Amino acid sequence: MDMMVPAQLLGLLLLWFPGSRCDIQMTQSPSSVSASVGDRVTITCRASQGISSWLAWYQQKPGKAPKLLIYAASSLQSGVPSRFSGSGSGTDFTLTISSLQPEDFATYYCQQANSFP
């Protein structure tokens, strides 16, 4: 028998981060997503000015430190499942979860950054 996990909110925050040369505003959309296990989820992030590929995506769960998922816009951090992917350059970026899993219900952040590990 198939079991449905109740839809939960993937909280997305509108965040503002300082850039290396001047202040760059990062805006995520949508502000929240109602989704179920197995869904394809797409989150977009727009920079107020071009940042090339200097964009990272983080996942944060309550009481935990943020976890780096994607760096340099599209590079998957070691150990992160391949269902996560990133794309974009310049001002428009996307994080995609190809098939949402129960452990993916969390808050996701984009961040402009001028260096990556």
From Swiss-Prot:
GO cellular component term of the entry, any? extracellular exosome
Compartment(s) of residence:
Secreted; Cell membrane
Q: Does the keyword Cell membrane apply?
A: yes
Record's signal peptide: 1-22
Q: Region (Complementarity-determining-3) spans which residues?
A: 111-117
Q: Name one Pfam family in it.
A: V-set
Complementarity-determining-2, as annotated region: 72-78
Domain Ig-like stretches: 24-117
Spans annotated as Framework-1: 23-45
Q: Does the keyword Iron apply?
A: no
One example GO MF annotation: antigen binding
Q: Name one GO biological process term.
A: adaptive immune response
Q: Where is this region: Framework-3?
A: 79-110
Identify the domain of life: Eukaryota
Disulphide bonds annotated for this chain are 45-110
Segments carrying the region annotation (Framework-2) are 57-71
Looking at the UniProt entry, the stretches that span the membrane are none
Subunit organization: Immunoglobulins are composed of two identical heavy chains and two identical light chains; disulfide-linked.
Q: What does this protein do?
A: V region of the variable domain of immunoglobulin light chains that participates in the antigen recognition. Immunoglobulins, also known as antibodies, are membrane-bound or secreted glycoproteins produced by B lymphocytes. In the recognition phase of humoral immunity, the membrane-bound immunoglobulins serve as receptors which, upon binding of a specific antigen, trigger the clonal expansion and differentiation of B lymphocytes into immunoglobulins-secreting plasma cells.
Q: What is the name of the protein in this document? A: Immunoglobulin kappa variable 1D-12
What is the originating organism of this protein? Homo sapiens
